[in-house]
C-alpha cells in the first residue's frame, strides 16, 4: 500500500523535479561564466538561492492576495470576537452550529477567507519535496529526471561547500555518526546550525518587530492576533527540527526563502500598512498627512450684527 502511494507521489513530483533541475542548471551555468567551477559547492548553493528567487518572484501575486486576506481578517476580527462572546460557554451542538454559520456569513459578506493566508506556504511545499528528491537522487545515483544527468549530475553530487560540506549531508547524519564513534563532519554540523540560527532570527525579528506594527489596536485582543503569537513559539521549534533533520541544500532553500519573506513583509507593510496600525500612522507622518482631528480650521468671518451682539 505505502509503496504504491510513494510511487504515486514520485510520479506527481516528476514534472516539478524537472523544472527545479532546469532552474538549478541555468543558474549554475550562469555562475560558471562568472568564474565558479563546475564542482564548486558555492556555485550550487547560489543556484539554490536562485531557485528561491524564481519561485518567490512567481508567488508575488499570491503573496499580495495573502496580505489582503490577512487585512480582511484583522478588519472583521472585532465582529468575530463579538460572535464568540455571544456564544461563550455554550457547548451544545446547535449553538456551535449557529456560531459557525454567523462567522461564515461574515466571511462571505466581507470577502474574507481564513485559508488564503496559508497559500504561499502550501504552494511552496511541492517545490520543497521536489528539491528534496533532487538532492536525494543526486546523492544515491548522481542522476536526475532532467539536465542533472551524467557528468553534471555527478558534479552536483560531489560538490562541497567550503570544500568539505556536501549539499546532501545533514546535522543528524553526522550527529548519529558522532554518537556511534564513527567519522563525522563537524563543519556540516556548524553550517547546519548557522543556517538554522539565521532562520530562527529572521522569523523572530519579523514576528516581533515587523508584523506587530501592522496590527490595529482594536485587533490585538482577537484570536487572530493570539494565533500569530502562538506561531511565534511554534515556528522556531519547527525550524530546530528542520535544522537537525534536513540536508544542507534544503536548509539553504528555507533560509533564503525565510529572508525573502521577512524583507517582503517589511516592504509591504512600509508601503501599504493596515489602517489604524502604528505602521499606518508612521506612513502618514512620512507623507506629511495631518490627522483630521488635529488639523486647524479656517476661522469664519463675523458679520457686523453678530459682532454687536457679542
From Swiss-Prot:
The chain crosses the membrane at residues 16-36, 44-64, 115-135, 186-206, 232-252. InterPro entries: YidC/ALB3/OXA1/COX18, YidC/Oxa/ALB_C, YidC_ALB_C. It is a multi-pass membrane protein. Pfam families: 60KD_IMP. GO terms for cellular component: plasma membrane. One of its GO terms (biological process) is protein transport. It is found in: Cell membrane. Residues 290-310 are annotated as: Disordered. GO terms for molecular function: membrane insertase activity. Its main location: membrane. Keywords: Cell membrane, Chaperone, Membrane, Protein transport, Transmembrane, Transmembrane helix, Transport. Interacts with the Sec translocase complex via SecD. Specifically interacts with transmembrane segments of nascent integral membrane proteins during membrane integration. Belongs to the OXA1/ALB3/YidC family. Type 1 subfamily. Required for the insertion and/or proper folding and/or complex formation of integral membrane proteins into the membrane. Involved in integration of membrane proteins that insert both dependently and independently of the Sec translocase complex, as well as at least some lipoproteins. Aids folding of multispanning membrane proteins. NCBIfam families: PRK01315.1, yidC_oxa1_cterm. This is Membrane protein insertase YidC. It comes from Tropheryma whipplei (strain TW08/27) (Whipple's bacillus).
